[in-house]
Regions:
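Extreme N-terminal, non-catalytic leader segments
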Residues: 1-10
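NTP-dependent small-molecule kinase module
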Residues: 4, 135, 142-143, 160-199
Length: 199
């Protein structure tokens, strides 16, 4: 049975750093249920993070072993430093069980997911303006000016790439978090109802 024909729904949410996508994904999950896909990464774990909940922290050699065994639906190197990947098995199991599974990944990963799972529903979160995005990156207080400049330039590239192709099913401007969450929930519910009617 092809994974694309399953009753579950794979929701991919992308957007640049600072746009609020992770908060939106968690709020959608709180309201609609489902499972959050935990990505594997080679980056170091921060003190606040929990292995297996926030990320699966693996060594570069373990990541390469998993990649060579086709254990990832998608994988990418981010900011030229650390690798990230979406483990295949939990996603496939959730879809087989008819669940909603949520992925918070970048455009590179979304392109790979679209190739492997054309029925995935993909939403891109946009900032209300470049100025607001820059402000959000600055007020996070996590990085110096050079790192903020790098993230802002990467965010612009990601937005340009996402909006220049027919990869995403919907775009949501996050100018108000509650409205953005409402819109995401509405879109996902409509998609699930449409999928259920076809099944």
């Amino acid at each position: 049975m092809s994974l694309d024909a399953q009753t579950g729904l794979l929701l991919v949410v992308s957007g640049p750093s600072g746009v609020g996508k992770t908060t939106i994904v968690h709020r959608v999950r709180e309201r609609l249920g489902g499972q959050f896909s935990v990505s594997a990464t080679t980056r170091p774990k921060s003190l606040a993070e929990v292995n297996g909940e926030d990320y699966l922290f693996v060594s570069p050699s373990e990541f390469e072993r998993l990649k060579s065994n086709d254990a990832f639906l998608e994988h990418a190197e981010v900011f030229g430093r650390h690798a990230y990947g979406t483990p295949r098995e939990p996603v496939e199991n959730a879809l087989r069980d008819g669940d909603l599974i949520l992925l918070d990944i970048d455009v590179q990963g979304a392109i790979q997911i679209r190739e492997h799972m054309p029925s995935a529903y993909m939403i891109f979160i946009l900032p209300p303006s470049d100025e607001e995005l820059r402000h959000r990156l600055e007020t996070r207080g996590r990085e110096d000016e050079e790192a903020i400049d790098r993230r802002f330039a990467e965010a612009r590239r990601e937005i340009d790439l996402a909006t220049s192709r027919t990869l995403y099913d919907a775009f949501i401007v996050n100018d108000n978090l509650d409205r953005a969450v409402d819109e995401a929930c509405r879109l996902v519910s409509e998609r699930r109802n449409t999928t259920a009617l076809k099944g």
